[in-house]
Curated annotation (Swiss-Prot):
<comment type="similarity">
    <text>Belongs to the ATPase alpha/beta chains family.</text>
</comment>
<keyword id="KW-0375">Hydrogen ion transport</keyword>
<dbReference type="Pfam" id="PF22919">
    <property type="entry name" value="ATP-synt_VA_C"/>
</dbReference>
<dbReference type="GO" id="GO:0005524">
    <property type="term" value="F:ATP binding"/>
</dbReference>
<dbReference type="Pfam" id="PF02874">
    <property type="entry name" value="ATP-synt_ab_N"/>
</dbReference>
<keyword id="KW-0472">Membrane</keyword>
<dbReference type="GO" id="GO:0046933">
    <property type="term" value="F:proton-transporting ATP synthase activity, rotational mechanism"/>
</dbReference>
<keyword id="KW-0066">ATP synthesis</keyword>
<dbReference type="InterPro" id="IPR055190">
    <property type="entry name" value="ATP-synt_VA_C"/>
</dbReference>
<dbReference type="InterPro" id="IPR020003">
    <property type="entry name" value="ATPase_a/bsu_AS"/>
</dbReference>
<dbReference type="InterPro" id="IPR036121">
    <property type="entry name" value="ATPase_F1/V1/A1_a/bsu_N_sf"/>
</dbReference>
<dbReference type="InterPro" id="IPR027417">
    <property type="entry name" value="P-loop_NTPase"/>
</dbReference>
<dbReference type="InterPro" id="IPR050053">
    <property type="entry name" value="ATPase_alpha/beta_chains"/>
</dbReference>
<dbReference type="InterPro" id="IPR004100">
    <property type="entry name" value="ATPase_F1/V1/A1_a/bsu_N"/>
</dbReference>
<dbReference type="Pfam" id="PF00006">
    <property type="entry name" value="ATP-synt_ab"/>
</dbReference>
<keyword id="KW-1278">Translocase</keyword>
<keyword id="KW-0139">CF(1)</keyword>
């Protein structure tokens, strides 16, 4: 194990000098530096650049407070390695695989794997056309998720990405079992804490591994924590042959941390100040999130859209890797429609008659047609009022409004805020409900009866309570 000495510390960037005869550590190797003489407080550094003349530039995974010039640095000879396997289930840990849930730390002999790996080769990949039922009507009907696919939840600040991810974790864990890995990348610690206790209460935590690198941590940790979560998911897929769910909240923070690291390393920024290696970094992460012949990884990624601008390089780069996109729209939150999923902007490769079936496809496309026509008529209604519409158009507007409200539903994870029980709606019930609305079966029921309900039977009960 070769050793060097700290030459300079600039925030999270640490330059380390190795003696001229020593072998320099490789890029991505983990280096260890002890803050104190009794070797209780260590900091892990990751090699990012070789500057020449025995000097390497590293990024710290923890705060560099207390580091001084001249401290000894040890090369571990390998990349950061994290615990994998069944021992990780029910536990919460950081980017380095250290437990942060106040329970017993992992044993020394636990299986560990490096966080940097190659993506599976082309001949190992497998594709599936099986739908993953989520119990959320708007998703299952208009932008269904594929088992083993990649899903992006796009939205600006405060439109409900994290709540939607939490509901998906709840529904999929309760209905499908299976193993989940939740990776919190640069998000709020409070939300992670809430999620942990919720999962503990519901018993879902026993089948979930949780990894966090939150907002307050150095950019190195936020940039690498997604790889830590992915490494755990890959082990369950490749070694145990499991179907794994990988939740990442938020993939934009991964890009943001990469941008900070890039600037600290002195690279010239690219478009909108992002790192020049944006597409490469995103590609290296996303290409590893895939399904092989041994098992599948279905990934659901929240993607923050800065200033609601979808042309921003960060969300635009992520778009290219996804099978399904669920777009959250601020206008819908203002109308009180939750989840605020835009039914026309959201899309899925799975919405085809070969995968979802003829009836589902026909109902979904008709729902989109009615909503699109309603959107076109809104300008006329705003200027001239409803009276200028033909009878046929008035009927269409009535149905479109009922459909728009029926696309909303109460969430189990939001019950503590709304006081209303959440609902899980099977795909067959979702398709039947929308088909009957399109047929005009419920034209007489008030629009408000369709708001925030589960299956169509709930609408009828709500209308009866309202006196219809």
């Amino acid at each position: 194990m070769s050793s060097g000495k700290i030459a300079q510390v600039v925030g999270p960037v640490v330059d380390v000098m190795f003696a001229s005869g020593d072998k320099l550590p490789e890029i991505n190797n983990a280096l260890i530096v002890y803050k104190d003489s009794d070797k209780k407080q260590k900091i892990v550094l990751e090699v990012a650049l070789e500057l020449g003349d025995g000097m390497v530039r590293t990024i710290a995974m923890e705060s560099t407070d207390g580091l001084t010039r001249g401290l000894e640095v040890l090369d571990t000879g390998r990349a950061i390695s994290v615990p994998v396997g069944k021992e990780t289930l029910g536990r919460v840990f950081n980017v380095l695989g250290e437990t942060i849930d106040l329970e017993e730390p992992f044993a020394e002999d636990v299986d560990r794997q490096p966080i940097h790996k190659k993506a599976p080769s082309f001949d190992e990949l497998s594709t599936s056309s099986e739908i993953l039922e989520t119990g959320i009507k708007v998703i299952d009907l208009l932008a269904p998720y594929l088992k083993g696919g990649k899903v992006g939840l796009f939205g600006g600040a405060g439109v409900g990405k994290t709540v939607l991810i939490q509901e998906l974790i709840h529904n999929i864990a309760q209905e499908h079992g299976g193993i989940s890995v939740f990776t919190g990348v640069g998000e709020r610690t409070r939300e992670g804490n809430d999620l942990y206790w919720e999962m503990k209460e519901s018993g879902v935590i026993e089948k979930t591994a949780m990894v966090f690198g939150q907002m307050n941590e150095p950019p190195g940790a936020r940039m690498r924590v997604a790889l830590t979560g992915l490494t755990i998911a890959e082990y369950f897929r490749d070694v145990e042959g499991q179907d794994v769910l990988l939740f990442i909240d938020n993939i934009f923070r991964f890009t943001q941390a990469g941008s900070e690291v890039s600037a600290l390393l002195g690279r010239m920024p690219s478009a909108v100040g992002y790192q020049p290696t944006l597409a490469t970094e995103m590609g290296q992460l996303q290409e590893r999130i895939t399904s092989t012949q041994k098992g599948s990884v279905t990934s659901i990624q929240a993607i923050y859209v800065p200033a609601d601008d979808y042309t921003d390089p960060a969300p635009a780069t992520a778009f290219a890797h996804l099978d399904s996109t669920t777009n959250l729209e601020r206008k819908l939150t203002q109308m009180g429609i939750y989840p605020a999923v835009d039914p026309l902007a959201s899309s899925s490769r799975a919405l085809s008659p070969e995968i979802v079936g003829e009836e589902h496809y026909a109902v979904a496309t008709e729902v989109q047609r009615v909503l699109q026509r309603y959107r076109e008529l809104q300008d006329i209604i705003a200027i001239l009022g409803m009276d200028e519409l033909s009878d046929e158009e008035k009927t269409l507007v009535g149905r479109a409004r009922r459909i728009q409200f029926f696309l909303s539903q109460n969430f189990n994870v939001a019950e503590q805020f709304t006081g209303l029980p959440g609902s899980y709606v099977p795909v067959a019930d979702t398709v039947r409900g929308f088909k009957e609305i399109l047929e005009g079966k419920y034209d007489e029921l008030p629009e408000d009866a369709f708001r925030s309900v589960g299956p169509i039977e709930d609408v009828i009960k709500k209308a009866e309570k309202m006196g219809f």
